[in-house]
Structures are given as C-alpha cells and as structure tokens.
Amino acid sequence: MKEGIHPKYEDITATCSCGNVIKTRSTIGHDLQLDVCSQCHPFYTGKQKVMDTGGRIDRFQKRFGSRIGGKKG
C-alpha cells in the first residue's frame, strides 16, 4: 500500500443527548453529538407507540376493510 494516502483512523467519542457516551474509531477526526441512540430510541427501549391521528385507521377500515384479505366477489 502507498504511504500517506489513507485518512487517519482515530479514537472519537459520540455523545447522545440522553447522556450515553459511545467510544469508537473513525476517520471523521472529531467527536460527534447524537440526537438519539439505542439507549433512548423508542424502538430499542420498547416504548414505541402507534399513533392513530384523527381516526385514519378506522376510516381506512370502513372504506377498504371488506376488500383486504377477502375474496373478490
């Protein structure tokens, strides 16, 4: 391999807004600030909620409920 053509691979710290600190290595060259991580994201914490805004699911079921999974007739 040629010398001096590859970026430096350095230790960095990624800090989440929840306070979780992740130490890793990267070529980015500076520390990162994260909005979410696996410690605070609802998908990973099991606190994920399904929001039915304005009864849209009910309205969809009324319009297309009989057609879904049923036989055409």
Curated annotation (Swiss-Prot):
GO terms for molecular function: metal ion binding; rRNA binding; structural constituent of ribosome. Its cofactor is Zn(2+). Signal peptide: none annotated. Keywords: Metal-binding, Ribonucleoprotein, Ribosomal protein, RNA-binding, rRNA-binding, Zinc. NCBIfam families: L31 (TIGR00105), PRK00019.1 (NF000612), PRK00528.1 (NF001809). This is Large ribosomal subunit protein bL31. The gene is rpmE. It comes from Marinobacter nauticus (strain ATCC 700491 / DSM 11845 / VT8). SUPFAM superfamilies: L28p-like. It comes from the Bacteria. Zn(2+) binds at C16, C18, C37, C40. GO terms for cellular component: ribonucleoprotein complex; ribosome. Part of the 50S ribosomal subunit.
